[in-house]
Amino acid sequence: MAKPTTIKIRLNSTADTGHFYVTKKNARTMTEKMVVRKYDPVARKHVEYKEGKIK
C-alpha cells in the first residue's frame, strides 16, 4: 500500500485557550509548519493557529 500524500494535522491556538482545529495538508508540497489565522471561539477573536501533532 502506498503512503498517502495528505496527512491530518492539528492546528493549536496560540491564545492558550486549548481550542484546536483538525485539517489536512499535502506533506510533499507544504514541508514547513502551517500557521493560519482563524477564529478562536473561546477567546472570541481571530488568533494564529500553529501546526501540532494529533495524539
Swiss-Prot record:
Tell me the Gene3D superfamilies matching this sequence: Ribosomal protein L33 (2.20.28.120)
UniProt entry keywords in alphabetical sequence: Ribonucleoprotein, Ribosomal protein
- Read off the InterPro entries from this record: Ribosomal_bL33, Ribosomal_bL33_CS, Ribosomal_bL33_sf, Ribosomal_zn-bd
Q: Which GO terms describe its biological process?
A: translation
The residue range of the signal peptide is none
Is Ribonucleoprotein among this UniProt entry's keywords? yes
Against Pfam families, the record matches this protein to: Ribosomal_L33 (PF00471)
GO MF term list: structural constituent of ribosome
The superkingdom listed in its UniProt entry is Bacteria
Looking at the UniProt record for this protein, which Gene Ontology cellular component terms does it annotate, in alphabetical order? cytosolic large ribosomal subunit
KW Ribosomal protein (keyword) present: yes
The record's annotation in PROSITE patterns points to: RIBOSOMAL_L33
Which family does the record claim for this protein?
A: Belongs to the bacterial ribosomal protein bL33 family.
Q: Which PANTHER family match?
A: 54S RIBOSOMAL PROTEIN L39, MITOCHONDRIAL (PTHR15238), LARGE RIBOSOMAL SUBUNIT PROTEIN BL33M (PTHR15238:SF1)
Q: What is this protein called?
A: Large ribosomal subunit protein bL33
